[in-house]
UniProtKB/Swiss-Prot annotation:
InterPro entries: ARFGAP/RecO, DNA_rep/recomb_RecO_N, NA-bd_OB-fold, RecO, RecO_C. NCBIfam families: reco. One of its GO terms (biological process) is DNA recombination. This is DNA repair protein RecO. Keywords: DNA damage, DNA recombination, DNA repair. It comes from Haemophilus influenzae (strain ATCC 51907 / DSM 11121 / KW20 / Rd). Involved in DNA repair and RecF pathway recombination.
Length: 236
């Protein structure tokens, strides 16, 4: 039985039986796991307001199977105030973690990246650099090794002004072809430095992470992306 409280966040929650919840958690020391929160849907349950996304929590659970039983959950701090686009971006980040990281695999570094990402979403006016940085950090932790500094075909250093075409599992090859897989050398150098201060670089980074994350996500569309699109259309 786990004795120490762990820091963590709710990634997703869904009904389980008449009064309980199944909750996907991301914790600092145990990684991602799923717990049953018994009675959390009951009218008088204090967990109903506690088990919310973007609230830093202190958690305890028990159980040896892949499905644990939550025994304690209390706020460690106030809920991070994500609103409008930042809120949907937070749902997107949560869905990424739910879909691509293995269950019960400790990753304290990723937890810190996630915490900084949520803080950035809550405080920054322009959230795009925060999102791109987290996506690249996630790819690094997943073991996605791409050389942004050298041409995969020749081994020559990437030239700032040249264009390069991405080839899965190989890297970037100098190319005059211009399509969705083509990137400028200046973009690749910025990717390596994790520098997303330039708008054109951010657009290129967004395009690249969609390509790079696809093998991990498969063909199933992201629900958070669909929800964001639907709500943007409603606001127009």
């Amino acid at each position: 039985m786990q004795s120490e409280l762990q820091r963590g966040f709710v990634l997703h929650r869904r009904p389980y039986s008449e009064t309980s919840l199944l909750v996907d958690l991301f914790t600092e020391e145990s990684g991602r796991l799923t717990v049953i929160a018994k009675g959390a849907r009951a009218k008088r349950s204090s967990w109903k307001s506690v088990l919310q996304p973007f609230t830093p929590l202190l958690l305890r659970w028990t159980g040896k199977s892949t499905l644990k039983t939550l025994t304690k959950a209390e706020p460690a701090a106030i809920t991070l105030p994500l609103q409008q686009i930042a809120l949907y971006s937070g749902f997107y980040v949560n869905e990424l973690l739910t879909r691509v990281i293995e269950s019960e695999t400790p990753n304290p570094a990723l937890f810190q990246h996630y915490l900084k990402c949520l803080t950035g979403l809550a405080t920054e006016t322009n959230i795009e650099p925060t999102l791109r940085l987290f996506e690249f950090q996630l790819l690094q932790i997943l073991g996605y090794g791409v050389d942004f500094l050298h041409c995969a075909g020749s081994g020559e250093p990437v030239d700032f002004s040249m264009t390069y075409r991405y080839r899965e599992e190989k890297g970037f090859i100098a190319s005059l072809v211009k399509d969705n897989l083509t990137f400028y050398g200046r973009d690749l150098l910025a990717f390596e430095a994790l520098d997303f201060s330039d708008d054109a670089v951010r657009q290129a980074a967004k395009r690249f992470t969609r390509i790079a994350l696809k093998p991990y996500l498969g063909d199933k569309p992201l629900k958070s992306r669909e929800l964001f699109t639907q709500n943007i259309l409603l606001l127009k």
